[in-house]
Amino acid sequence: MKIARVCGTVTSTQKEDTLTGVKFLVLQYLGEDGEFLPDYEVAADTVGAGQDEWVLVSRGSAARHIINGTDKPIDAAVVAIIDTVSRDNYLLYSKRTQY
């Protein structure tokens, strides 16, 4: 899994039938020190994440099975909203201090 920040949404009125009702988010990936990387991806949202929240992203075949246990044509899915991230006893992110 990877860590990313929600930086936007994608709206699509015409899509593959199995994607009906799926919410899509624009994500910006983060580096090991919590810095924002110039890497973006669109992911299906399974947890109701909002703007600027840090999230865990599952990719590949695991992401395709997360939504209702069926194969859907997605490459990435948001599977958790992060409360805190720390590394080497240093707090990189806390949702509590962000809001």
UniProtKB/Swiss-Prot annotation:
GO terms for cellular component: carboxysome. Residues 1-83 form the BMV domain. GO terms for biological process: carbon fixation; photosynthesis. The keyword Transmembrane does not apply. Keywords: Bacterial microcompartment, Carbon dioxide fixation, Carboxysome, Photosynthesis. Its main location: other. Gene3D superfamilies: EutN/Ccml. It is found in: Carboxysome. The keyword Lipoprotein does not apply. GO terms for molecular function: structural constituent of carboxysome shell. It comes from the Bacteria. Probably forms vertices in the carboxysome, a polyhedral inclusion where RuBisCO (ribulose bisphosphate carboxylase, rbcL-rbcS) is sequestered. Has been modeled to induce curvature upon insertion into an otherwise flat hexagonal molecular layer of CcmK subunits. The tight homopentamer forms a pore with an opening of 4-5 Angstroms in diameter which opens into a wider tunnel at the base of the truncated pyramid. The pore is positively charged. Homopentamer. May interact with CcmK2, this occurs at very high CcmK2 concentrations. Interacts with full-length CcmM. Belongs to the CcmL/EutN family. CcmL subfamily. This is Carboxysome shell vertex protein CcmL. It comes from Thermosynechococcus vestitus (strain NIES-2133 / IAM M-273 / BP-1). The lineage of its organism: Bacteria, Bacillati, Cyanobacteriota, Cyanophyceae, Acaryochloridales. The gene is ccmL.
